[in-house]
Amino acid sequence: NIEGDTEIADAYLYSRWKNSRAFNLATQIGLSTKRAEVEFFDGGFSDGVDRLTVATASLIAEGVDERFRGLYRGSITFHKGLNDVLGSMDETGNNNSLTKVGGAPTLEGGFSKLTSTYNRLQTVSRHHSLLLLFAGQYSDDQLSSLEKMSLGGPYTVRAYPTGEFTGDRGLFTSLGWIINGGLFSDSIAFGDYGWSDILSVTVFADYGWGKNRDGSGAVERQELSGAG
């Protein structure tokens, strides 16, 4: 019997610096505490605990591209893990980290990583649009499972189950072609709703890449792709 437990508490300050229909610019600073543990035999044995305290700073931009008829949103975030702050692990992982370094439970709580996202919904014609998704992560540190980039599942490479691969570094990109129901019929479906309001068909292609270092110098890489 194996049980996993994850807890995350988060506080942040969101500030909007520019607010208009065409363009919005905001920043967000935050502090979070995170905990992950895996137990065996109804709690009789623990494989270790990852405890993190993470400070973040984000820049977020979104708007309407009136010239090319598109909606977009992008962000870039710096994450800093802090050693021995608010219960986080020290430089040796309290000798009990869930994530192992070369097989030893010594993952430290300190780390740095950079993440970014960009999404764009592009109108092509009345009934056709394209959806571009991008997410990326970079770190020179070995990360806890709480901080790795996850590939697989409904929000990344959809042909694979959630968490098929997790990496300290990674990227995900997807292109979708969306056809709304108005292409098939301009009539009312029911009430005040037309087919373009209630029906859409999407064809998509996903790609993900991830990379890990295990603390002993070994490197693991994985590529995932799918379409539907």
Task: Name the predicted role of every residue range.
Residues 96-228:
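C-terminal transmembrane beta-barrel domains of outer membrane proteins
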Residues 1-145, 211:
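Transmembrane beta-strand segments of outer-membrane beta-barrel domains in Gram-negative
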